A protein has these predicted regions:
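N-terminal secretory targeting modules
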Residues: 2-115, 130, 181-185, 198-201, ...
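Serine-dependent acyl-ester chemistry module
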Residues: 8, 133, 153, 192-365, ...
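Generic structural signal for small/hydrophobic residues in well-ordered secondary structure
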Residues: 46, 121, 171, 187, ...
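Membrane/wall-proximal cationic-aromatic binding patches
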Residues: 54-151, 276-278, 283, 291, ...
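Conserved beta-strand elements of the Class I
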Residues: 115-119, 159, 187
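A conserved hydrophobic secondary-structure block that centers on an alpha-helix together
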Residues: 151-180
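Short, amphipathic alpha-helical "lid/cap" segments that border enzyme active or binding sites
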Residues: 168, 172, 302, 306, ...
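Histidine-centered active-site loop/cap adjacent to the catalytic His
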Residues: 372, 393-423
């Protein structure tokens, strides 16, 4: 017998069969190692995004830009921050407790303050530029540089009432739900020619399929008045709830979803919940807004737009505010080169396109409503001719910081001429 046999007796187990506890411990260790190997890089990625921002190349977001809203269909998550990185820009977005981008503005208006509420879509939201570069912030700075006159305001505040993907219906609902609480002295609506008419019409967007709509629409009744269709998005389910929590709280998850899965086409499991407007992609083509021969659906879309703008004006005026309309043009309306890319070498004559047509339509609506109207095409074209461009991003199609600066200056002049604001 080996001399060490008495010192180390054999284990009383069946030969060739490891103990049950040992097997469990082995598997627990293996699972722990796998989880550690998976989680440690994610935790490191989470920490690096929070400390350094978008340090990795590529196009992605480190947070969620929009969440579902029971009244507007969608809006910004409150008290949320994220980075947005694209080929053309990188921006940091911070929302306040009310869901607006930028600093918090108290609801109660301080004495001596003149407030301007700006309603609009992604051009007001302006996620393509930094907070101080947005036209609403530049406008605020321009106005506050001129305070001090006898009997005038001691401060101007421009209140953010914009969100990407909104149409005039959502802007009206925001005015009623939140905007009027700020006691604005003036309400400006920034109307984007490119898609606001289509956003206002369920016929243009979804062929009238109400069951696909998950944002609010106003639709005509037989008597010509408008009926509000409330949003009815599908419930997200368990996986949807988990994903929404991760989108709100994990930079790494947002990076993986927006920067990896989306590119691989593997992020559509929850697409119905994430979709902002509808359960299917809106069908209207933005270029049709330039067509001078209106089909029935476009004629209806313009009529709905006319009625909605009147409702916004009435709501503002009834609560003691003045109201103005600002036309935000497309890149093709400002740049001749961009217009040729849309309409062809003949400028759209053969296709029946006129890039000034939507402007004339909106100007007629403003005249009917007795509403001061500013068309931003002339100042933007003049600035482009003077070499101040680029005013729009080529791919993203929204204003650059230079475009926002031109808009702010033009709106400032408009306010002085119409209401002596800032003079």
């Amino acid at each position: 017998m080996h001399p060490s046999a008495d010192l180390f007796p054999a284990s009383p187990t069946t030969p060739g069969s490891p103990p049950r506890l040992a097997r469990r411990a082995t598997w627990a260790l293996r699972i722990g190692l796998i989880l550690t190997a998976f989680l440690l890089p994610l935790l490191a990625l989470e920490a690096l995004f929070r400390v350094d921002g978008p340090f990795l190349p590529g196009n992605y977001d480190t947070g969620i830009r929009l969440v579902r809203h029971p009244v507007y269909g969608h809006y910004h998550p409150p008290d949320h921050q994220l980075w947005i990185q694209r080929d053309e820009f990188t921006t940091h977005i911070q929302t306040n407790a009310a869901g607006q981008r930028g600093r918090s503005i108290p609801v109660e208006k301080p004495p001596g303050t003149f407030r301007i509420l700006v309603l609009g879509d992604s051009f007001v939201e302006a996620e393509q530029v930094h907070e101080h570069e947005r036209f609403i912030r530049q406008l605020e700075a321009i106005l506050n540089a001129q305070v001090g006159g006898p009997g005038g305001p001691t401060r101007y505040e421009v209140v953010d009432g914009g969100c990407g993907g909104w149409g005039t219906a959502q802007e009206l609902l925001y005015l009623r739900e939140q905007g009027l609480a700020y006691q604005p002295d003036l309400v400006l609506l920034a109307f984007f020619v490119g898609n606001d008419v289509g956003d206002n019409s369920i016929e243009l967007a979804l062929d009238g399929k109400r069951e696909f709509a998950i944002k609010p629409y106003y639709v005509p009744r037989p008597d010509g008045t408008l009926e509000l269709l409330h949003p009815n998005p599908p419930a997200p389910g368990v996986l949807g709830h988990v994903a929404n929590v991760l989108r709100l709280h994990s930079t790494a998850y947002n990076f993986l979803e927006s920067g990896v899965l989306r590119k691989l086409g593997r992020d559509d499991l929850l697409s119905a919940w994430r979709t902002l407007d509808a359960l299917e992609r809106p069908r209207y083509q933005g270029n049709l807004v330039y067509r001078t021969r209106l089909t029935d659906d476009w004629r209806s879309g313009w009529a709905i737009t006319d009625a909605l703008l009147g409702m916004v004006r009435d709501e503002a005026v009834q609560h003691g505010s003045r109201f103005g309309l600002v036309l935000v043009p497309t890149r093709g309306q400002v740049s001749d080169e961009a217009w040729r890319g849309i309409a062809g070498r003949d400028g759209g004559r053969q296709a029946g396109l006129d890039r000034t047509f939507p402007n004339s339509q909106l100007q007629k609506i403003a005249a009917r409503l007795s509403t001061p109207f500013l068309d931003l095409v002339p100042p933007l074209r003049a600035a482009l001719g003077e070499g101040q461009g680029p005013l729009y991003y080529d791919n993203d199609q929204h204003w650059t910081a230079a475009g926002h600066a031109v808009a702010a200056q033009a709106i400032g002049r408009f306010l002085r001429e119409q209401w002596a604001v800032g003079s």
